[in-house]
Amino acid sequence: MRQNNLFSLIFWLVPVSLIIVVSAQLCSEKFGTFTPGGTFDKNRRIILSSLPSEVTAQDGFYNASIGTDPDQLYAMGMCIPGAKQKLCRDCIMDVTRQLIQTCPNQTAAIHWSGGGKTVCMARYYNQPSSRPLDLESVSIGYNVGNLSTNLTDFDRLWERLIAHMVTKASSASIKYLSFDNSRFYAADETNLTNSQMVYALMQCTPDVSPSNCNTCLKQSVDDYVGCCHGKQGGYVYRPSCIFRWDLYPFNGAFDLLTLAPPPSSQLQSPPPVTNKDEKTIHTGTIIGIVIVVAMVIIMALLALGVSVCRSRKKYQAFASETADDITTVGYLQFDIKDIEAATSNFLASNKIGQGGFGEVYKGTLSNGTEVAVKRLSRTSDQGELEFKNEVLLVAKLQHRNLVRLLGFALQGEEKILVFEFVPNKSLDYFLFGSTNPTKKGQLDWTRRYNIIGGITRGLLYLHQDSRLTIIHRDIKASNILLDADMNPKIADFGMARNFRDHQTEDSTGRVVGTFGYMPPEYVAHGQFSTKSDVYSFGVLILEIVSGRKNSSFYQMDGSVCNLVTYVWRLWNTDSSLELVDPAISGSYEKDEVTRCIHIGLLCVQENPVNRPALSTIFQMLTNSSITLNVPQPPGFFFRNRPESDTLRRGLEPDQYNNESVTCSIDNATITTLLGKTLASALCCITSTLFSKSMYRNTED
């Protein structure tokens, strides 16, 4: 048996003393090794790549298994309760990357990260979860500073606090924020003196029993005392539990705590040391102190500089649409032969859809995992840009309402994306694509309302909670996939764009998207922002309520040319419930439906400033007490573009006829350079120019 303990030491200067914060990793060969590139390794990469999104989606703790013997493995990830989702996701993403890079062939490994703004853990192993409690694998560290108070009094208070926390952590169930990952967790603070606090944190993984949690924590406390008694802080990491304490708050674990009542007696601050014989400090002592402090500051500045350079390089690789190097996500790369085997060499019967730049196949990996394989067209120049954009972008996005990228393959002219397989096809299949009423009936109002909420959460993540602000630019029913439980997942990020810090809008000469879903400022001037996605989402909300396509409404008199104009007329005549899909008539909540229609109209207002942000939309949907603004008239702008694929070709807006057609939103007469009937016809035609979805539906 051989074990490699790998520690990342981060030095930082704090007012108390020089602190050593350690992230600990253990690569163990106790249960054997595997062949790099083999089935076990591929399973490991797949399941570890899923942890960042699954841990945040499952309230801070997730465990799962993949594959079959002898290549089956188990994995888990965990963050401390109260951790913000972005911090948790980023922490898990970092530790899983470390596991893949630094444990090349071990069948069991664990990484605890406690050096940032939160604490997280990821591990994998080839033994079932019923394994015995592992107390042998341990990492211990301590603060290099010594306590300057009376140790007898300190030990009494410290032991009282720690004993209380062991009991609390092995039996308590405290809930913080939206996270329910609170089993076997305790974070507490108490007074040592009038001006000094002590902070402590304990946590066990939720898969252990209360007695094992208690045993693990007690052993960790004993190990710390035996190693590091008298120090100003320290930690003990084990595969099933962690223990840390210090004289300052750490990892954001104490942000939500109310100050604990002080113990019955406090330690008194030691009196200042005076010595009549020491009237001056030796010059050598001063020089030594200055040198030490200077070295620490230099080390900190160097670490900061390296971090800034790395983040800049990372951003540049992420932002460039024409970058040739996608090795930043190399651990997601599949061998092209494995993809060919998974799809039976792209057998026609495995084809499940037609994407905007290629075909989509259903495949089964060697470990039994079903996947969706997007094979980009070899003849599409734009497809290569889309491919790079989607790999670099989607690999960094982890959310339960986004389709998860499992990997990619790149060899010669072959450009392939591998996604999680979503079994229930796309939303448009159920809303519009089936003549079978039972299919449409599967989307009752409760499911439709949940779908609206799920899309809201996914877009909110893209706009606000991801590392960069992401504009999807092609939100529509065919790009919303439904999982086995009819939960929505936003797909097709080939057109997505990212914003820099503090950037709120951008413009492009290559307008891409789908007529009827694009806001007027984007079609007319190429301007896009988060409010562009809001407009598209508003149209989609109205489609979900009505069960009809935006382009399916047309009257030759010009009074109605699409769904938005139709809804606006209903709204102004207090008859908005006439919009509701007959398939759900009599089985919906009128207040919820009316509110969704109201929100949809707020989203499609002509002025982007008037459209609500996704965070506001989320509040509107979850808090019925919020009063909604009165919607302003929706915006309509359609150019005379005779070819169905003009938007996909990336031509400049001024290359087209600038004659515009405006649909009537009230009883006023349409006045354009075109005839009234021709204007109405063109309005309808342009609003029906839909781009192809990731999954084209070909069956009922």
UniProtKB/Swiss-Prot annotation:
Gene: CRK30
Bilayer-spanning residue ranges: 286-306
Catalytic reaction(s) noted: L-seryl-[protein] + ATP = O-phospho-L-seryl-[protein] + ADP + H(+); L-threonyl-[protein] + ATP = O-phospho-L-threonyl-[protein] + ADP + H(+)
Membrane-topology annotation of the record: Single-pass membrane protein
Cytoplasmic topological domain residue ranges: 307-700
UniProt source species: Arabidopsis thaliana
EC assignment: 2.7.11.-
Name the record gives this protein: Putative cysteine-rich receptor-like protein kinase 30
Xref: Pfam families: PK_Tyr_Ser-Thr, Stress-antifung
Keywords: ATP-binding, Glycoprotein, Kinase, Membrane, Nucleotide-binding, Phosphoprotein, Receptor, Repeat, Serine/threonine-protein kinase, Signal, Transferase, Transmembrane, Transmembrane helix
Compartments where found: Membrane
Cellular component GO terms, alphabetical: membrane
